[in-house]
Regions:
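Short, polar/acidic, helix-capping and beta-turn segments at strand->helix junctions
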Residues: 2-131
Length: 131
């Protein structure tokens, strides 16, 4: 796997317009871009931060699967939210995905590129290897 670089797309128009990949597999690492709660097929987004968090994680899960990775392989997660007070309501959803994995984590308060976006999640993982 060393030396191989593979680009993963979600089909989002944002990827074409901005010039990035949903994820990049480089060697045995998977780097998933900051992912928002857009449903990329419908290009819609909920106004509810908890629903957005759930959709973010579904979008990330698809990218991880295409990369040959899974939740147990995630080593780092970054959460970016414009409103700090929106983070705690998301904890039950985040715990469902990361509770047993317990990756290194950071939460950052910052503006996002679209005012409808309430949370963005980025992960780094290893390519899954069966032992």
């Amino acid at each position: 796997m060393i030396g191989m670089r593979r680009l993963i797309s979600s089909g989002s128009s944002f990827e074409r317009e901005i010039g990035y990949s949903r994820a990049v597999v480089d060697g045995d690492w998977v780097f998933v871009s900051g992912t928002t709660g857009f449903d990329y097929e419908a290009m819609t987004i909920s106004d509810n931060v908890i629903e957005q968090a759930e959709q973010c994680l579904r979008n990330i899960e698809m990218a991880l699967a295409q990369a040959g990775s899974r939740w147990a392989d995630v080593v780092r997660v970054r959460y970016i939210l414009p409103r700090v007070e929106d983070f705690e309501p998301c904890w039950p959803v985040l715990r469902r995905y990361f509770g047993d994995v317990r990756p290194a984590a950071t939460m950052i308060a910052a503006g996002l590129s679209d005012p409808r976006m309430k949370i963005e999640i980025e992960v780094t993982a290893k390519v899954h290897v069966e032992l």
